[in-house]
Amino acid sequence: MESSVKPNPFLSFSSFIHHQCTRFSSDLSARIEDTKRFAETLATRRFSLPTPPPFASVSQSKSGTPTTTLSPSLVAKALAGTSVFTVSNTNNEFVLISDPTGGKSIGLLCFRQEDAEAFLAQARLRRRELKTNAKVVPITLDQVYLLKVEGISFRFLPDPIQIKNALELKSSGNKNGFDGVPVFQSELLVVRKKNRRYCPVYFSKEDIERELSKYTRASRGDQQIMVGSLEDVLRKMEMSEKNSGWEDVIFIPPGRSYAQHMQDLIKE
């Protein structure tokens, strides 16, 4: 048990909850139509593991004294074990969609395998050579975080069920949309073990509800589930100093409990 209590970064949720409309719709058909529009031109690029992360760490200072932000490897470690799905060819190259507005080549990363399969079907319609040599492959979020491909940006396609869950948790006046990949957290599930503190963050509302039912006696109305976006959490981790509380975040893969995930990490 720690002698001093660290601040829980998730309690400052006025900035954590997004209040603007989103490009991600809970209607899967609309999201697939959006993918079709981008898929007029397809390109391929190889996987590349870089030294710097795709999300730049922002240094902060107090009274002119440099401070240390969380390292890219520490942020990536928090993402270990969670897989997303994309489409690659037999050479292990991303199949990309090109923005017809003249922008970037975009790698699509799906939280559901079935969404990646739908993207693959569209890619095969657009390019003949992909009919036999393209496939859906998993890639872990820590690999995505450390991946640097020049000129390519990634777009996440969240689970539409979790978009719906996130909107239900938002205030009634702000349900027009949700920006980003929903993640869920509860102060009731923060774990303190020896000299460490762990703040589990879930990609599935059903998973966090299951955990709360096991470890707390709180009724459904008192479970204190908070919702934010993966992208926002990563930005805050990158900008935060050590011992700020953000280094305690650990992402729990969909379908896994905190205990199962920790066991998986020990085995690796």
Curated annotation (Swiss-Prot):
- Transit peptide, first to last residue? 1-59
| Record keywords, A-Z | Chloroplast, Membrane, Plastid, Protein transport, Transit peptide, Transport
What topology does it adopt in the membrane? Peripheral membrane protein
What GO terms fall under cellular component here? chloroplast; chloroplast envelope; chloroplast intermembrane space; plasma membrane; plastid
The cysteines covalently paired via disulfide bonds are: none
List the subcellular locations.
Answer: Plastid, Chloroplast intermembrane space
Query: Is Transport tagged as a keyword?
Result: yes
**Single biological process term from Gene Ontology:** protein transport
InterPro entries for this protein: Tic22 (IPR005692), Tic22-like (IPR007378)
Known function? Involved in protein precursor import into chloroplasts. Imported into the intermembrane space via the Toc translocon. May be involved in the import pathway used by proteins without a cleavable N-terminal pre-sequence.
Q: Which family does it belong to?
A: Belongs to the Tic22 family.
Could you tell me what this protein is called? Protein TIC 22, chloroplastic
Instruction: State the gene name recorded for this protein.
Output: TIC22
